[in-house]
């Protein structure tokens, strides 16, 4: 215990001694150097042999001098600590070594530092030394020296007296973030290009496919412009009120791009007044049904598809009547479920 207190007392006495006592100061300095040298020799004797087989943890410690005498106006302690001490904490986590800033000027309160230095306690003996960074590593031999090497390389970057280097700029950004003066305020989302989410329901717009309806009954009318084959189901209609291309061609407009393939037309698109509704009302469905129950009058009657229909009924399919539609677009009352027109009697066989 006497040796631990002896060195701090020598340092405190040397600092408190008046500079006019030159010889006394020299003797004290020699005594301090001798005592520190003896401790160093003891440590060297203990570390004379290194056991790497057992892989036991060893303790390494190095004191790195901070160049405050060469650059007295630069705040090395502030750069080493960083905002709220985060820089030194991250440096210790990265290197796996313990780092402590010791020596004269390591405390912010100079009066408190001087008081502790004169107290003579062993834990404050470092206040009489030069400002330095104590690096300590406790690990197996190979890893310990690797950590110490990494720590020395990293600590050297913090001892460069540059106010605008990368470390300093990063600390300024971190400080502004901690103070809440970041340009982009907290809580504001990052602006970016929105992602369009496609709807799961099928589109019913122009050209959109819709689920096919159930098979219709016999005698259901088919849209205009579609080819009807025996036994084939009609094409499902599109949404009501959506403009669709006509079956007959129209004059091309300059700059007009050709539309996609024609989609099925709706029954409500044309109404029942133009074309089918207006002309077939004169001839009721009973006229067609009579041909099944009454005997045939002559052979040509079976091949005459205009039987019972006057000539004006076919003339009404003029091109100008295709463009006229009823404004209400409402379907007439449903008729009987019988066939819309009579098929050839021999076609069934």
UniProtKB/Swiss-Prot annotation:
MF annotations from Gene Ontology: mRNA binding; poly(A) binding; poly(U) RNA binding; SH2 domain binding; SH3 domain binding
Keywords, sorted A to Z: Methylation, mRNA processing, Nucleus, Phosphoprotein, RNA-binding, SH3-binding, Transcription, Transcription regulation
PROSITE patterns cross-referenced by the UniProt entry: KH_TYPE_1
Extent of Basic and acidic residues compositional bias: 340-349
PTM comment text: Methylated. Phosphorylated on tyrosine residues by FYN. Tyrosine phosphorylated by PTK6 and SRC. Tyrosine phosphorylated by SRC during mitosis.
Pfam family, one: Qua1
Subcellular location: Nucleus
Modified residues (Omega-N-methylarginine): 230, 240
UniProt keyword annotation of Nucleus present: yes
Example of a GO biological process term: mRNA processing
KH domain sequence ranges: 65-135
GO cellular component: nucleus
Function: RNA-binding protein that plays a role in the regulation of alternative splicing and influences mRNA splice site selection and exon inclusion. Its phosphorylation by FYN inhibits its ability to regulate splice site selection. Induces an increased concentration-dependent incorporation of exon in CD44 pre-mRNA by direct binding to purine-rich exonic enhancer. May function as an adapter protein for Src kinases during mitosis. Binds both poly(A) and poly(U) homopolymers. Phosphorylation by PTK6 inhibits its RNA-binding ability.
Name by which UniProt lists this protein: KH domain-containing, RNA-binding, signal transduction-associated protein 2
Organism (species): Rattus norvegicus
